[in-house]
């Protein structure tokens, strides 16, 4: 698409960053001075009843800056990148038609990628193939199936944990149905995003600072009642660690503590480590991301001014 046709498209803003980088705080500040509406791009914030461990914006923050695509699923339900793209496009169209600018804020980079580039059509689920995979898993174990995926699609195998049966099963299913790997199919993009997108990435200048922020926030979550939140989910009786919701960082480790598998101190240690690993994966995405302007989260005033310098002109 040439520059002239791009300029005729409606505007949108991406504010991306690793966990605990200050994305939400900056987005709320920007909403005070720009004609924007916020859309959450976070695979954990979609779940109802999961507020503390996901660092969901609190009531005062949401009153000042409402976020769309929060609390749209029960923790028992799945939500895919394709679901997100559909929902985000609908919200963006609604915001744009009201004369405002969509500001998409979050750290689920797969969602940003799906929205920006589109998704290739994947084969629909096949109950017979899925049943055969599950039977194999029952006989051989998911570790053996992960090894099978490693031979078929090493790129997907590196991204999917052996203890993630839902995604592991889907990757194998796609290959058995189509004869093509999940990696091969997802590299074929669908429809690109029909917006002129201004992209920003916010993070601390050093990894050590990010690690400090992560550890501090995890302890703040514990002090705010995170254990009670997860115990309430545990008490429902219908949730388990194969669900994407309970595999969210922090929740998986607290769940293991509640089940008596690990000590409290081990839960804290593992929770902080898992969050750091998540941030590392997010930063890897961002370093390879084209077209983003970097902002320093340790200097929020300067970050705000830098966004306004770029976005102020499009908002007039």
Curated annotation (Swiss-Prot):
Region described as Interaction with substrate tRNA: spans on this chain: 42-45, 166-170, 247-252
Catalysis: reaction(s): adenosine(37) in tRNA + dimethylallyl diphosphate = N(6)-dimethylallyladenosine(37) in tRNA + diphosphate
Residue positions binding ATP: 17-24
Record-level Gene Ontology MF annotations: ATP binding; tRNA dimethylallyltransferase activity
Obligatory cofactor(s): Mg(2+)
Site (Interaction with substrate tRNA): residue numbering on this chain: 108, 130
Disulfide bonds: none
This enzyme's EC code(s): 2.5.1.75
Domain of life of the native organism: Bacteria
Pfam families the UniProt entry points to: IPPT (PF01715)
Keywords: ATP-binding, Magnesium, Nucleotide-binding, Transferase, tRNA processing
Binding annotation for substrate: 19-24
Gene Ontology biological process terms in this record: tRNA modification
Protein function: Catalyzes the transfer of a dimethylallyl group onto the adenine at position 37 in tRNAs that read codons beginning with uridine, leading to the formation of N6-(dimethylallyl)adenosine (i(6)A).
Family stated for the protein in its record: Belongs to the IPP transferase family.
Subunit structure: Monomer.
Name of this chain's protein: tRNA dimethylallyltransferase
Protein's gene: miaA
